[in-house]
UniProtKB/Swiss-Prot annotation:
GO terms for biological process: defense response to Gram-negative bacterium. Disulfide bonds join 31-59, 38-52, 42-60. This is Beta-defensin 6. Its main location: secreted. Belongs to the beta-defensin family. The keyword Transmembrane helix does not apply. The modification Pyrrolidone carboxylic acid is found at residue 23. PANTHER family: BETA-DEFENSIN (PTHR20515), DEFENSIN BETA 4A (PTHR20515:SF2). Residues 1-22 form the signal peptide.
């Protein structure tokens, strides 16, 4: 039974740094500071970089 606690602690420690690197852009200020613009859809030479505070408004950055 003790091995389960050790295994859980090991997995928790190994996965905790990944949460910091998986966050997307979440505000218009952050989007613009990364060189993006807030639009309804990312077309052409733009790619999705996150959202601008609302799920339907996307932060689009050049590819």
């Amino acid at each position: 039974m003790k091995i389960h606690y050790l295994l859980f602690a090991f997995i928790l420690v190994m996965l905790s740094p990944l949460a910091a690197f998986s966050q997307l852009i979440n505000s218009p200020v952050t989007c613009m500071s990364y060189g993006g613009s807030c639009q309804r859809s990312c077309n052409g030479g733009f790619r999705l970089g996150g959202h601008c505070g609302h799920p339907k408004i996307r932060c689009c950055r050049r590819k």
